[in-house]
Amino acid sequence: MSKKVTETVEQLVTPILNEMGLELVDIEYVKEGKNWFLRVFIDSDDGVDIEQCGVVSEKLSEKLDEVDPIPHNYFLEVSSPGAERPLKNEKDFVKAIGKHVYIKTYEPIAGEKQFEGELTAFDGTTVTLSVKDRGRQKTVAIPYEKVASARLAVIFF
């Protein structure tokens, strides 16, 4: 049911976001404890503010009431993806070039399955990172199809 709910919500929210010049980053429909949460993450090139999240929440709530795809009570949350935004598609990887990222792979690449470093290039088939290895910078090329998950990473100095 979770996949069907997220697909329905995506169909409902996309026109709202397009009208406002925003983009859909992700949708989560999860149970935490006794409560269900429908989380919609939105963004734009300029970021999003609380007013935009509120408008999307109100408009989406109206659509959800009409279609009623969820048979029980739930909490609707609309927010930005935050500082550690997930990279979900090719467009996200292109936008993240020059930024610090964290990537997990399905299988080992050069003996590792987790990488953190600067995303230096993405050509649609290969993600190229500059990572520190024992105090030295090295380049790692990760086949895009081997990426299990990726997100922006915050660097603490």
Swiss-Prot record:
Among CDD domains, the record links this protein to: YlxS_C
Q: Please, one GO biological process term? A: translation
Give its localization: Cytoplasm
GO CC terms of this entry: cytosol
Cross-referenced InterPro entries: Ribosome_maturation_RimP (IPR003728), RimP_C (IPR028998), RimP_C_sf (IPR036847), RimP_N (IPR028989), RimP_N_sf (IPR035956)
Superkingdom of the organism of origin: Bacteria
Q: Print the keywords alphabetically.
A: Cytoplasm, Ribosome biogenesis
**Chief localization:** cytoplasm
Task: Return the similarity comment.
Answer: Belongs to the RimP family.
Function description: Required for maturation of 30S ribosomal subunits.
Name of the protein in its database record: Ribosome maturation factor RimP
